[in-house]
Amino acid sequence: MDERKKVVFSSVGASGRMAIQMDGAWRTFWQGLVDKIPAHRFEFLEMAEVVSSFTTGGDRALVRSVENFEDYMTFGAKQVDEAEMGPGDVLVALSECGLSASINGSAVRGYELGVKTYYLFCNPEKILRTHLDRARAVFECLDEYAANKKKGIDNGKYIVKIPLFVGNMAVSGSTRMQVTTVELLAAGAALEVAANRWLKENLTEQELSVIGGQMLSLDEYAEAFVSLNKQLSSGKALKGLAKAVDFEVNTYNQKGLVTYITHQYLLDIMTDTTERQPTFTLPPFRKFNDHTSEVSWAYIKDPLYPNEVAWQHVFRRPIKGLEWSKEDYIKMNASQDIINNPPMVSGNEVLEYVIGNEDDPSRYSRECSQLVLIDVNGSATEEIVNWYHQELTKYSGGVVIRFGQIPTTKIAKDEIRIPVELPRTCTDIMYHLLVKVAFNALSTGTMAKMGRVYGNWMVQVLPTNKKLIDRSSRIIASLAKIPYADGYDPCSVG
């Protein structure tokens, strides 16, 4: 950070969207300091650019999953090359359960380039080493680095593993809950601790006093997360969460639609709503000018800004699309299907998903259509509340769901309250975690009540890549009580 080197988060799927979220929260914090402490404005703007992110499939994957892309180590390696990283830069490879080839490929490539590479994984190392070639490639880099270090050899290469095994999933069939949550906690806490250290070293006591928020130790982040889970699973918070689940179940049982609106936490909620499609085989987000595809059950809009500006507030950096040609895919040994029909994942694709405050009749096109205002710590300003009440007349109904430190004054007739008290920190990581965990529970609870969870299996997963084909095979084998090998077509897995 002192040398303004890059810190780049690389990930896929749910963790990829989480990486974009951390990137955005980091930029928001430093850009927000410019008005508070203008004497350091140039330093703050430089610091905002230190952290960056990329996800497999590019930023388009934020709104719609890109099928099969995570199956290729070459894709992840190319994204590292395009990030123009070099010695002194840091690559944080958030590999989720260690199964995604693209992130393993980015970790290997980072190591080859002499980038300081950190590899986070949430499965037992022995299992990954024994059964997965794509994971073994990363561990071979780790072995080489350890051997060279022991011999006193410094060849400029650096890689460190950070195991985050959290045990078996209570509700299985998606990595988006336990695995992505623990990665957000670990990586987000590390970012905040680094930011706080820099601030203490470079600002005066009076300057520090106006920043606001607490500076936690790593142990205190763990304690805060324990508190988050305890509060959310008991008392008023649990009752509010259950009420929100019933609200959504009732809406969808009437073939209705839910449209969330928020500004400050738009990216957090977009992440959950996007993940519902592959996790529960629901209609994905559709482009604004697409009038033939099915409308997504849930959607998200920014009440303050039109589409182009709303997207700028989501990323707080230029949109990163993948401008890859057919020749690029051939060089990366992509499947013939991808070569023949390259997916539309350019930067311009993102803007075709309208999340701004433009009128969208498709969201209230059904008899049952619900407008849901999300308020976190009183983030719903008067302007947002007024927009909600104005737009509500177009919908059949609506509700305000309020999280965190909830002001006593009501802002709507119908409110669902989920009170949780957590520390406020520089990027507000604990409240981002609250929204993530709460919405994961909301969407999973809703799908469970609608029969899309059987036992503890999310049975309607959409098997669009090797990892999900494997997962679907395990579900079939478990429920049908047959050997795993009989649960899939080996030709499909490859």
Can you annotate each of these PLM segments?
Residues 1-494:
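Conserved N-terminal alpha-helical segment that immediately precedes and caps sugar-phosphate-binding
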